[in-house]
Amino acid sequence: MSRGKNARDDDDVSRLLAAAAKTISHVRYCWLLTGAIHARPMGHVMSDPDDWHIRFVTGSRSRKAADIRNAGRIGLIFQHDPSEAYVALTGAATLVGASEVERLWKPAYDMYFPTETDRVNATFIQVAVERMELWIRGVTPEPFGLQTTELARNAEGTWRFSDRNLKGSKSNADSG
């Protein structure tokens, strides 16, 4: 693979990651799906778009917390209709410990955990995003919605086009 092709792929991946982060920042709620086919809308807190860790506050005694303890993998779906942008993320999910809950806690969460018992049983789901599927009008290849653009994080943490990416999608990105 030529150095120019690598640089072009890096630029394309950076552009796609920026568009995905922008989409997520515009969406107040997303769907969180566990392997047990349980899904529910969740308000999200994205720590830093560069590290692709997303957190949610939840009760440690909830069904979704139990699902995460059992499976440790989840999917997240974000949809921003005004910009015709759709982002599906998958990754490893963990429940953070008490000291991390204290560090991340904000007074705004008290309304969802009104009693001391509720607050003691609060935790954060932390998702380390490993893969993403993107459909973002004006960013992913045309014709819009017919091909999925997939990115995957390698062992070093670098984002690349997924091996499962359709060749047509990748070549369309290369031609621009």
Predicted regions and their residues:
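A short mixed-secondary-structure module that forms the rim of ligand-binding clefts
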Residues: 45-83
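Short solvent-exposed loop/turn micro-motifs enriched in small/polar/acidic residues
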Residues: 25, 37, 86, 117-120
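Short, basic/aromatic recognition patches
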Residues: 9-29
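Charged, gly/pro-rich active-site loop segments
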Residues: 1-12, 88-176
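Histidine- and/or cysteine-centered catalytic micro-motif in compact active-site loops
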Residues: 35, 59-61, 79-81, 89-94
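Positively charged, polar, low-complexity stretches
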Residues: 39-41
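A short, Trp-centered hydrophobic/proline-enriched beta-strand micro-motif
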Residues: 22-36, 74-78
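Charged, amphipathic alpha-helical segments
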Residues: 13-17, 58-62, 110
